[in-house]
């Protein structure tokens, strides 16, 4: 006999069963040493958002705080947390995909937050479709796409950020379609937030391509946010009358732009002024918005058969005085979003390019082309119709091509499924296929970058196997997230390397044979071919580091040492010379991961510390003689003393360029001067030289991190500007008088001889090169001003 359960009991039982199944799944996965993707239950193609959502779901169910009676809860959760830490980080994910866990030995992690953090603080906006969580690699492309963005920079532990979250969600729904609403987690993307000048949370900024970011400082209510946003929306609502009607309509129709017109009679419903403004912003560049006061423009309304309040969309060429015409769209809604969506759906599709004229059309203009097979899949996202307008200033035309009408053409382009591609005005020879998100802002960024870049899509017919010119070739797979992240950086690099080497991409899912020929075992693999020389790139996914890699191939920053040169250059070094040496083996995964960081570090230490490397596979007996017992072994050889063989071994956990440089600089004599209140007053405030001062506190972590950077700065500006340090814990009154409110703080003091006075300025950067460039710029400006003042006298 069956037992009937009521609804609540049934739901509780289902939840219990679901939890049991989830726990069982994780136990099986953890116990069988599955890979990180399996641990989180995501595919290798998962986006950052999907990874966060999967981890949060597991964290809330399996956190040790929720499972106090499970002795294995801590260990099991560490494995899941470790998987998340690696897969959320683009560089670590690339290392893991290429080397597995062996490539992560320098990044052990091992810490996690409380259950309440994952429940209330983690991924605040991941479940809100109207809010786009932006990451560093996509931020600039998004805000420079041409659309208007309002971005919330927040920190997970910030109470004010959580107070704002419900309002931000309501606001996002209110303005959906009018502008893009974004969010940046400064806990995950600290570098991005620092680059954008975010010093407090939440910080709200408006972004649009071509204009400086505008910070919002007003009340955090939905109404105030909407009012502020509307100030930056491009809106033009035209009041139509007998005097301007014909000219306004004909001018727009001639440009291929239709009109949305609301006819208003007193006492009847028509679109409010606020709704008209919103629609004008939402339809900017697509449709003009106007209104007619039929009480004062009676004859105009009668000529258009408008006898009651109504709203209609008139496409270009529509007959206005015949409302029976099927081309006119009458709208019954008074809601801006509903009207917007209905009009967007009714806008014409992109031009269908014919097979016999395709080559000619692509040879004379730059095009963004949607390829489809039979059914046009773009109709599912009507917002893409904005592309034509948003790309107009870039002189990019937008069209579509049906591959079922000419399969041979698509086959020659290696197009075997629906996609979109940019053609650069040279027919079908120069093109690039889009592998990113099929959403408006991502496509816009791709199109703008691609037409101006010099990236060639490679295949068997144009692969530079025997080309005399140097090539940088990226072997990739479209499903691979790190590959997709690298592509925009390659475009940036290609413009800066134009004329020096060529840049191409090869899709290994299509050209498997070519990739196998070059023994490509992981994606992305980026290789420089220079005739017989082949060099694999191992650095971060940034244009800057790609350029550094190319420069290092031309002018190596690391000396490759042999036993003979090691003896001559290191052991017999001059008295004032110092060396840092990396003993490595080519087969060692941590060594491979270290090498690009080692080269990067070497470039920043030019003129200060000599940097070398020894291949212990090639010189095994020599390394044994030098007592090298592990790889990589990093040693610092200080200024020569009576003990020529003295060295210091690096035992730090982090082997990135910044950490290694800080370690090496720590052995050099201090270049800056420690100042007391008396010497600060005498030498800086009353002295006759230029100074840059680091105000710090010994207990301050950022101060400790900045200390070696300041020492590097002191050496870079030696002879031009003196560098000093003031301990604000020991001398608080000196720092208070100097206006210091945070540590570390850097201030520049320039002495003006004519006035015998000191000019001072706060410096916000923490990068030695940036500060040095800023100081030299200020000196040049300062000296020019002094010269002008003399000339005037």
From Swiss-Prot:
Disulphide bonds in the chain: 158-161, 480-483, 588-591, 700-703
Subcellular location: Endoplasmic reticulum lumen
Enzyme class: oxidoreductase
Principal place of residence: endoplasmic reticulum
Keyword terms, alphabetized: Disulfide bond, Endoplasmic reticulum, Glycoprotein, Oxidoreductase, Redox-active center, Repeat, Signal
Glycosylation site residues: 530
Signal peptide: 1-32
Residue ranges constituting the J domain according to the UniProt record: 35-100
Alphabetized PANTHER family for the sequence: DNAJ HOMOLOG SUBFAMILY C MEMBER 10
Name by which UniProt lists this protein: DnaJ homolog subfamily C member 10
Upper lineage: Eukaryota, Metazoa, Chordata, Craniata, Vertebrata
């Amino acid at each position: 006999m069956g037992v009937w359960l009521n609804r609540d009991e049934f739901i509780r039982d289902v939840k219990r069963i679901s939890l049991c199944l989830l726990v069982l799944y994780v136990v099986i996965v953890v116990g069988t040493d599955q890979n990180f993707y399996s641990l989180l239950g995501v595919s290798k193609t998962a986006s950052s958002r999907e990874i966060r959502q999967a981890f949060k779901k597991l964290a809330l169910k399996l956190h040790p705080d929720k499972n106090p009676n499970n002795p294995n809860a801590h260990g099991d959760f560490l494995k899941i947390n470790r998987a998340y830490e690696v897969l959320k980080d683009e560089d670590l994910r690339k290392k893991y995909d290429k080397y597995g866990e062996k490539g992560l030995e320098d990044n052990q992690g091992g810490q996690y937050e409380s259950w309440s953090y994952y429940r209330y603080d983690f991924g605040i906006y991941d479940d809100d479709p109207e809010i786009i969580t932006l990451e560093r690699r996509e931020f600039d492309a998004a805000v420079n796409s041409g659309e208007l963005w309002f971005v919330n920079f927040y920190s997970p532990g910030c109470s004010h950020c959580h107070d704002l979250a419900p309002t931000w969600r309501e606001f996002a729904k209110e303005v959906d379609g009018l502008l893009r609403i974004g969010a940046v987690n400064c806990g995950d993307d600290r570098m991005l937030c620092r680059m954008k000048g975010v010093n407090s949370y939440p910080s709200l900024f408006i972004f649009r391509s071509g204009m400086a970011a505008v910070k919002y400082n007003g009340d955090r209510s939905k109404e105030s946010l909407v009012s502020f946003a509307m100030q930056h929306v491009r809106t033009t609502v035209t009041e139509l009358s007998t005097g301007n009607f014909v000219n306004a309509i004909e001018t727009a129709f001639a440009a291929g732009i239709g009109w949305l017109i609301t006819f208003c009679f007193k006492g009847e419903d028509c679109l409010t002024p606020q709704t008209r403004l919103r629609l004008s912003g939402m339809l900017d560049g697509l449709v003009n918005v106007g209104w007619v006061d039929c009480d004062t423009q009676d004859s105009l309304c009668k000529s258009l058969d408008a006898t009651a309040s109504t709203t209609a969309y008139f496409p270009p060429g529509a007959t206005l005085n015949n409302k029976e015409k099927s081309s006119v769209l009458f709208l019954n809604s008074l809601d801006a979003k509903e009207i917007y969506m209905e009009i967007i759906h009714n806008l014409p599709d992109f031009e269908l390019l014919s097979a016999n004229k395709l080559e000619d059309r692509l040879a004379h203009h730059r095009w963004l082309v949607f390829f489809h097979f039979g059914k046009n899949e773009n109709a599912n996202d009507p917002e893409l119709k904005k592309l034509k307008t948003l790309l107009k200033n870039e002189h990019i035309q937008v069209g579509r091509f049906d591959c079922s009408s000419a399969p041979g053409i698509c086959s020659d382009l290696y197009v075997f499924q629906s996609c979109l591609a940019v053609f650069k005005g040279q027919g079908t020879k120069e093109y690039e296929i889009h592998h990113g998100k099929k959403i408006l802002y991502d496509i816009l960024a791709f199109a703008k970058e691609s037409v101006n870049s010099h990236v060639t899509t490679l295949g068997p017919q144009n692969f530079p196997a025997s080309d005399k010119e140097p090539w940088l070739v990226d072997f990739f797979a479209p499903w691979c997230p790190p590959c997709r992240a690298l592509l925009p950086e390659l475009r940036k690099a290609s413009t800066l390397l134009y004329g020096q080497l060529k840049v191409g991409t090869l899709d290994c899912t299509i050209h498997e044979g070519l990739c196998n020929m070059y023994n490509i075992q992981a994606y992305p693999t980026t290789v420089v071919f220079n005739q017989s020389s082949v060099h694999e790139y191992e650095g971060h996914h940034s244009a800057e580091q790609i350029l550094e890699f190319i420069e290092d191939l031309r002018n190596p920053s690391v000396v490759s040492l042999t036993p003979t040169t090691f003896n001559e250059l290191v052991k017999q070094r001059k008295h004032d010379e110092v060396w840092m040496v990396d003993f490595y083996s080519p087969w060692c995964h941590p060594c491979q991961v270290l090498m690009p960081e080692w080269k990067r570090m070497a470039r920043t230490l030019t003129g200060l510390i000599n940097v070398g490397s020894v291949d212990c596979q090639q010189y095994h007996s020599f390394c044994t003689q030098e007592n090298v017992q592990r790889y990589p072994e990093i040693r610092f050889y200080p200024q020569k003393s009576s003990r020529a063989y003295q060295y210091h071994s690096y035992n730090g956990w982090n082997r990135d360029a910044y950490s290694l440089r800080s370690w090496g600089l720590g052995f050099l004599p201090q270049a800056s001067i420690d100042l007391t209140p008396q010497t600060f007053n005498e030498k800086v405030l009353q002295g006759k030289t230029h100074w840059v001062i680091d105000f710090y506190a010994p207990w301050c972590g950022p101060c400790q991190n900045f200390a070696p950077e300041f020492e590097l700065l002191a050496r870079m500006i030696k002879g031009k500007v003196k560098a000093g340090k003031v301990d604000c814990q020991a001398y608080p009154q000196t720092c208070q008088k100097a206006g210091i409110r945070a540590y570390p703080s850097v201030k520049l003091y320039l002495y003006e001889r004519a006035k015998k006075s000191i000019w001072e300025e706060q410096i916000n950067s923490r990068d030695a090169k940036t500060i040095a460039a800023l100081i030299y710029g200020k000196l040049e400006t300062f000296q020019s001003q002094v010269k002008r003042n003399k000339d005037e006298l």
